[in-house]
Amino acid sequence: MALRALLVALVALALAGAALAAGSKSTLRITYWPHGRSQSATTWTLGCGPAAGTHPARIRTCAQLKAHPADLRPATRACTIMPTRTSPQAAIQGTWAGRPVNRSYRIGCPGWSDLRLVLTGRS
């Protein structure tokens, strides 16, 4: 009887762990406008755990985001740089560690330098 209770508890823990892992899935869509939003954009997908998608540096990008997950949180400082029509811009939408992400970035604004590899595909 005790063995059966232990087995039931282990199965319940395994199912809870699988549900938690599924809930923390990380899938992002990154759109990059190298010459401003008036020009054409490049869009990549990025999945982490394992690294997947079309992002050109997906393995390094996943490693960076796992090491610094706070980089995807909303900026704590406002951007004081006026955008120009041709300023590089980027946007990230999707889910990171089970939480929704919907952010926009402009060159020189909070978040851009920390996420350069993620946003532009280049370090």
Where in this protein do the model-derived segments appear?
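N- and C-terminal low-complexity/disordered segments
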Residues: 2-123
